[in-house]
Amino acid sequence: MAMGRESDRQGDLMVSWAEMPRSPGHVFYDRLQEVLIAGGFDLFVETACQPYYAPKMGAPSVPPGRYFRMHMVGYFEGIASERGIAWRCADSHSLRDFLRLENREEVPDHSWLSKTRRRLPHEVHESVFGWVLQLVAEQGLVKGKRIGVDASTMEANAALRTIVRRDDGRTYREMLTQMAKESGIETPTADDLVRIDRARKSKKLSNEDWISKTDPQAKIAKLKDGRTHLAYKPEHAVDLDTGIIVAAALHPADNGDTTTIAGTLSAAEKNLAQIDAAPTKDKPSELVADKGYHSRAVLKDLNGGVWKTRIAEPKHPGFSRWHGDDKARAAVYANRTRLGSGVGKEAMRRRAEIVERSFAHNLDRGGMRRTWLRGRENVHKRYLVHVAGHNLGILMRLLIGAGTPREAAAPALTYLLFIYTEQTVALILVVASDDGFAILVMSLMIQPDQTGTSATGCYPNAGLDPMPASEIPKAAHAVECFG
């Protein structure tokens, strides 16, 4: 066989449709496509977006369903920037199929994503989030009985060096330069400014005094890793029984937890009402949160309403003084009683696992720990579709056993162990993947006076949430415990 050379190749003058390259298919995106098409996703999106396009005049736009699909790809692939999303979609035949592109169509440019986001209002993005919530609720993934609330930080697309004083518009460097001149240094160097900044007593950057010229809505805050940066505050309301996010709010980073919880709960009630799962006074839902949300005002407002609080209480030195506020005392004591029960302790453990996991998936693995957009409304539009992708991932894990494309493509390892003793014969099947591992145990106990007895134990996600063998029917012939 002769060696082929790149220099000897001649380009094709014509290519038939059958010879054009196409995707062999992706198990995750193909199944997700079936779910979206069966649910009428494109028709719903086009109907919701129709009022914001010209009725007749003008060239037809790119279908808006493609806009939301590309942002879902951003979540599943962990891509933060819209430019990166466009590059990734153009580089994959399977993603081209997921976007429903024809052979001659190109992947929309990243600038089209920005233009479409500016064209479509916030309400359309909320409606898409609600459509996905309705879809997962039809599969029984929204219980609405226990809701966990927590917040995190999202780094804004603005640097601290862009902040200026609200009163006179001076930058931080200009302020230090003026202080140096007042101290007798006519032409201060960079080292002089650093020395003056270190010696300055009042070094706290206050949002009341400073604002960013690049993103005025971003606030100075301390991030989870300890750095001080301009940021936003995403807050989740999560169904603790399934992990579905029922509300994803985005607040200013300088607002405390006790200030933002009312808006997040209002959004959760609205979204749950659309799927007939809203809490009522007769059937309240449990609200589980950490001690950052504990305050007398919050507990008093929620007591006797549609939320039954289980909010962790910080330790206070001494005795509580109520000053005649009997409603606050009753609310605090009722919350403390519910929190101390076994159900309350289990709910707090569940909150720490499920709610924190939602931030890990959306911010860290999903690529939204730092946003590349500016303006709280723009960031929230992108984040709502991002979280909708998270909820679809949970649905996909129910349907095919994998919540991300990487997990679906990862091979599962299977181990078969055979253990034999004088009185027992055991068969152990271990299936492991990136998501965890499961164990199937089948044993045969040999006794002198009997032919034998058998027992079967199934341990899904072994090591994390084991299921006792006593809960599995004995003498089972086949048990499916992984997937």
Protein language model features and the residues they cover:
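Basic, short loop/linker segments at the boundary and entry of helix-turn-helix/winged-helix-like folds
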Residues: R22, H26-M72, E77, V379
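Short, flexible loop/hinge motifs at secondary-structure junctions
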Residues: M1-R22, A408
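Position-driven detector of the extreme protein N-terminus
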Residues: A2, V15, P21, V73, ...
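Anion-binding and metal-coordination hotspots
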Residues: G78-A90, L101-G483
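Intrinsic-disorder-associated interaction segments
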Residues: E6, P21, G25, R165-G169
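Amphipathic alpha-helical interaction surfaces
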Residues: V73-F76, D91, L95
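Peripheral, non-cofactor segments flanking catalytic/redox cores
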Residues: D8, T47, H71, R96-S114
